[in-house]
């Protein structure tokens, strides 16, 4: 099984690719799709879709896991929701089964505690994937946690 985990955003979309082979989880790739704030929003959304398509074509995942948001009066809400919609559409274009998880469920799945801080989640991700250096930037590390959640809760 190969899964892509995605941490949505307009400025930065984190992604992480993990293989699960006979119960062992192996990090294949992780990184970010970054868009410049100087571009028009519609150009940034197209860039996210195009870059995500390239990642999907390169790594050919079997499924996807995406962080689900619940916003309350945030100025970034609309932009992030639009980016998330483009991400969901792009995943759908490749007919990938999609799992969605809120942040607390991701923390619970990865650490066993739904109110864990970022360092606890990061340590568990590094341990589970047998990696010695923290994935950078944080969005990529978060995407790996989302992918692990997709594996654990499949």
UniProtKB/Swiss-Prot annotation:
Question: Known catalysed reaction(s)?
Answer: Endonucleolytic cleavage at a junction such as a reciprocal single-stranded crossover between two homologous DNA duplexes (Holliday junction)
Where does the record place the catalytic residues?
Answer: 7, 67, 139
The annotation note on the cofactor reads: Binds 2 Mg(2+) ion per subunit.
Keyword annotations: Cytoplasm, DNA damage, DNA recombination, DNA repair, DNA-binding, Endonuclease, Hydrolase, Magnesium, Metal-binding, Nuclease
Q: What is the lineage of its organism?
A: Bacteria, Bacillati, Cyanobacteriota, Cyanophyceae, Synechococcales
Top EC class for this record:
hydrolase
**Family statement drawn from the similarity comment of this UniProt entry:** Belongs to the RuvC family.
Originating organism:
Prochlorococcus marinus (strain NATL1A)
**Protein known as:** Crossover junction endodeoxyribonuclease RuvC
Coarsely, its chief localization is: cytoplasm
Q: Where in the cell is it found?
A: Cytoplasm
Select a single GO molecular function from the record's annotations and give it: magnesium ion binding
Q: How does it assemble?
A: Homodimer which binds Holliday junction (HJ) DNA. The HJ becomes 2-fold symmetrical on binding to RuvC with unstacked arms; it has a different conformation from HJ DNA in complex with RuvA. In the full resolvosome a probable DNA-RuvA(4)-RuvB(12)-RuvC(2) complex forms which resolves the HJ.
**Binding residues for Mg(2+) 1, per the UniProt record?**
7, 139
A Gene Ontology BP annotation from the UniProt entry: DNA repair
Instruction: Identify the domain of life.
Output: Bacteria
Cofactor dependence: Mg(2+)
Q: Which spans of this chain does the record mark as coiled coil?
A: none
Q: Name one Pfam family in it.
A: RuvC
Which InterPro entries does the entry mention? RNaseH-like_sf (IPR012337), RNaseH_sf (IPR036397), X-over_junc_endoDNase_RuvC (IPR002176)
Q: Report the GO terms under cellular component.
A: cytoplasm; Holliday junction resolvase complex
Q: What does this protein do?
A: The RuvA-RuvB-RuvC complex processes Holliday junction (HJ) DNA during genetic recombination and DNA repair. Endonuclease that resolves HJ intermediates. Cleaves cruciform DNA by making single-stranded nicks across the HJ at symmetrical positions within the homologous arms, yielding a 5'-phosphate and a 3'-hydroxyl group; requires a central core of homology in the junction. The consensus cleavage sequence is 5'-(A/T)TT(C/G)-3'. Cleavage occurs on the 3'-side of the TT dinucleotide at the point of strand exchange.
Q: Does the keyword ATP-binding apply?
A: no
Give the residues the record marks as binding Mg(2+) 2. 67
Instruction: Give the EC number(s) listed in the UniProt record.
Output: 3.1.21.10
């Amino acid at each position: 099984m190969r899964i892509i985990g995605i941490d949505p955003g307009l400025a930065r979309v984190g992604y992480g690719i993990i293989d699960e082979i006979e119960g062992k989880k192996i990090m294949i790739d992780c990184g970010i799709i970054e868009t410049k704030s100087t571009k028009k929003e519609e150009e940034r959304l197209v860039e996210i879709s195009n870059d995500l398509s390239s990642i999907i074509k390169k790594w050919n995942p079997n499924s996807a896991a995406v962080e689900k948001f619940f916003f309350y009066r945030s100025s970034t809400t609309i932009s992030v929701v639009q980016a998330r919609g483009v991400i969901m559409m792009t995943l759908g274009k490749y007919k990938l089964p999609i799992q969605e998880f809120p942040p607390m469920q991701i923390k619970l799945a990865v650490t066993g505690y739904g109110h864990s801080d970022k360092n606890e989640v990061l340590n568990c991700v590094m341990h589970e994937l047998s990696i010695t250096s923290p994935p950078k930037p944080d969005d990529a590390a978060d995407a790996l946690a989302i992918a692990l959640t997709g594996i654990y809760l499949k």
